[in-house]
Amino acid sequence: MEGSEFSSTTSTSRPELFDFEGISMVHYFTDDWENVQNFHARPDDILIATYPKAGTTWVSYILDLLYFGNTAPERQTSIPIYFRVPFLEAVLPKIPTGVELANNLSTTPRLIKTHLPVQLVPKSFWEQNCKVVYIARNAKDNVVSYFHFERMTQAQPEPGDWNSYLQSFMDGKKVFGPWYDHVCGYWEKKKTYSNLHYMFFEDMVENTDREVENLCSFLGLSTPKEEREKITKITHFDAMKQNKMTNYSTIPVMDFSVSQFMRKGKVSDWKNHFTVAQNEQFDKHYKEKMKNTTLKFRTQI
């Protein structure tokens, strides 16, 4: 089935947040829930998982190039990334559901994206021992990016002002639930599930070549160095921002006059948004929320 049309592009058409399976959600990511949970993963599927605005599209594009850049180069110039790497739980206007897109993929492996927290990932991915690539981004930059994203997309609730948005992020009242639980959930899963590769957005920005090499090692790919360097260049943020097949300018739910889908792609942009008081409050809250995990982030590089 296809997602319903938006009635308008005004704030009145934005969905309401509601509690669902223990997290906050909007209907665009729950309307096809039964089919999502019953999704039949294959052993060679690769699941790309992130909290929203943590580098999903970047890593999706890298993986697409690693597997199909040479064998099917026309994909890169003619098929938008959201068709090449379906968003599994999404039911958005004017395009098939994520499950339909995933089931219709003719590629091997199938690259599939999700923002679901680890406990809501369809069981078949674990049962089939699929490779899972998780990308995490420091909370301060993540909340800034998510704020600007929610300003420009009609598939998310009205974000309100920055101060109230930051508070709701700290309270975990964001689509796909609390950032803290999301990043820690996959970090804990990694301890018992060896086919999970945990990446950091900050490491990607600092040294993309190295991170692509590590990704290849995890995937068992013997991609030549010159090929990896080429991929690093093609997937540079500025290049992707100009690329209509990766910048989401062809999807109907986003208003680029408000903000770009791919806005800055930098580390430490949070310093341009947080006041001193907000930063102190956030740090105190963060320390409490993250006190029981070994997971560490960098807020600058």
Predicted regions mapped to residue ranges:
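Hydrophobic alpha-helical segments
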Residues: 218, 222, 234, 285-292
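Acidic/polar loop patches that form or flank catalytic/metal-binding clefts of enzymes
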Residues: 74, 223-228
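Acidic/histidine-enriched alpha-helical segments
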Residues: 228-234
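PAPS/PAP-binding and catalytic site of the sulfotransferase fold
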Residues: 57-69, 199-223, 231, 239
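Short, internal active-site loops enriched in acidic
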Residues: 117, 204, 236
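Generic structural signal for individual residues within well-ordered alpha-helical segments
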Residues: 143, 166, 205, 212-213, ...
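PAPS-dependent sulfotransferase catalytic domain
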Residues: 1-199, 245-301
